[in-house]
Amino acid sequence: LQNLGNRGKGYSVRHGVGVASGAAIGFIDADDKTDISSLPTLLEELRGSYDLIVGDRTMPESQISIERRPYRQWGSDLFKYLVRYAVGLGEFPDTQCGYKLFRAEVARELFGRQRVDGYMFDVELLILAKRSGLRVKRQPVVWRDDPDSRFKPLSGSLRNMRELLAIAWRRPR
């Protein structure tokens, strides 16, 4: 798939979901931080009990091979606090883990209502899932931090805060 210009991660994933086929639709970050060896098991769980499975690095069973730099961890902790209290997603302490898997009809329904084009699209999706009463499973992951990440802490954090506040203000339905 190609976009004309950089429209944002949320836009790109929404575009991909729009053309995807199959009984399950998912996405994983392209930077190879998250191990996907559990995918066959997760697909079985989607066929049974769950509508959506989200990777969660905060779960005790998760295996983190490289710890984040302190300033990145502090920023992450502040973000989690805001997600919990500004948008009411306390039951999802790791909204930004780039490992999510949906039943296809659930993905189409959620992404049909999702509007955020940037990185905070995950937050909006989880709000929509929660308000729709979907069955969501948090899944521990095997994850490797990238000390050479292209994320710019100051400008990226400000952009993400703007998107997060817009989501909190708009209250997706």
PLM features per residue range, with description:
Residues 4-19, 24, 37-119, 146-155, ...:
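Acceptor/aglycone-binding surface of glycosyltransferases and processive sugar-polymer synthases
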Residues 123:
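DNA-recognition element of transcription regulators
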